[in-house]
């Protein structure tokens, strides 16, 4: 039985970990995940999804703030693991740790060399890609730069957002890893180097990137909104305050950019640089997320055709 150290943090990683545990060919010696964090307005301390799985299976859990130079890393190196599997861990692995095992592989949610970095699923949606995928790759010191062992992809559906694609690709990654790992460990798969000329990056979304520019086309804004939902959530401004938009669809119509061109009890359509957007789920400042109908019957009851969105 192959002895592994597993490293990961979000639900994507938890799906991969459950797959390894159910497979029966792997002995998970330890699980490494990010420290518990305070989340939400009430700052409730919350463990990571990977930690929840680890505790469910009574696995040893390590949560170093920084792995490099930590006591936890020394302990991990002394476990006698054959290899390391990572999936959206969130930290760089020191070369010293990588060199202490026979192999180290990463489950990365993109079709490398496209979208190295921490937000590949977001960028696949924001850029309007037709497909998204997962690559199993060897771990090296440079971020997501290792040789590629295997990859698989799925079509991006019109209804997908970051949350749905995250869940789908977690299953793709789990299955691909379980199919790939035995042959890789046996030496029957030869990894392929990434083409440096095709490398692109997907750094974590910055706050200024969350703002909707109504001069863009309706299609671009549609992709931005779904490419940031359920996190970090795209926003515009209404009456000078932040106005989050969780869901919208393309609509017919033209008009002055950012202005309301149609309004009913259940519909609010805003003109863009090309075409229009019909808002479906929104969150005004200081309010919970709500349907556009609830907004128009409440805080937005006075909105009229010609009103402007986007001005701070």
Curated annotation (Swiss-Prot):
InterPro entries: Fmt (IPR005794), Formyl_trans_C (IPR005793), Formyl_trans_C_sf (IPR037022), Formyl_transf_N (IPR002376), Formyl_transf_N_sf (IPR036477), Formyl_transferase-like_C_sf (IPR011034), GART_AS (IPR001555), Met-tRNA-FMT_C (IPR044135). It is an enzyme of class 2 (transferase). It catalyses: L-methionyl-tRNA(fMet) + (6R)-10-formyltetrahydrofolate = N-formyl-L-methionyl-tRNA(fMet) + (6S)-5,6,7,8-tetrahydrofolate + H(+). The keyword Disulfide bond does not apply. Keywords: Protein biosynthesis, Transferase. One of its GO terms (cellular component) is cytosol. Disulfide bonds: none annotated. The keyword Chloroplast does not apply. This is Methionyl-tRNA formyltransferase. It comes from Streptococcus suis (strain 05ZYH33).
């Amino acid at each position: 039985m192959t002895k592994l150290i597993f490293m990961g943090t979000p639900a994507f990683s938890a799906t991969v970990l459950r797959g390894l545990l159910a497979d029966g060919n792997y002995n998970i010696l330890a699980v490494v995940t990010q420290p518990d964090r305070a989340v939400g307005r009430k700052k409730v301390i919350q463990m990571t999804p990977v930690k929840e799985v680890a505790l469910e299976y009574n696995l040893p859990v390590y949560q170093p703030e920084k792995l490099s130079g930590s006591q936890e890393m020394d302990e991990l190196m002394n476990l006698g693991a054959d290899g390391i599997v990572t999936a959206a861990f969130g930290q760089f692995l020191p070369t010293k740790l990588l060199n202490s095992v026979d192999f180290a592989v990463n489950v990365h949610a993109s079709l490398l060399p496209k979208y190295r970095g921490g937000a590949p699923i977001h960028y696949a949606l924001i850029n309007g890609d037709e497909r998204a995928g997962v690559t199993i790759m060897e771990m090296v010191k440079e971020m997501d730069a290792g040789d590629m062992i295997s990859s698989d992809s799925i079509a991006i559906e019109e209804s997908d957002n970051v949350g749905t694609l995250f869940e789908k690709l977690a299953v793709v990654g789990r299955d691909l890893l379980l199919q790939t790992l035995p042959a890789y460990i046996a030496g029957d798969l030869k990894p392929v180097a990434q083409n440096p000329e095709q490398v692109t990056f997907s750094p974590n979304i910055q706050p200024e990137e969350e703002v909707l520019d109504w001069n863009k086309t309706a299609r671009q804004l549609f992709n931005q909104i779904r490419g940031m939902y359920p996190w970090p959530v795209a926003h515009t401004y209404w009456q000078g305050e932040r106005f989050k938009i969780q869901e919208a669809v393309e609509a017919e119509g033209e008009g002055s950019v950012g202005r309301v061109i149609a309004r009913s009890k259940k519909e609010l359509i805003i003109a863009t640089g090309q075409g229009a957007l019909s808002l479906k789920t929104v969150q005004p400042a200081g309010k919970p997320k709500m349907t556009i109908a609830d907004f128009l019957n409440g805080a937005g009851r006075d909105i009229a055709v010609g009103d402007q969105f986007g001005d701070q």
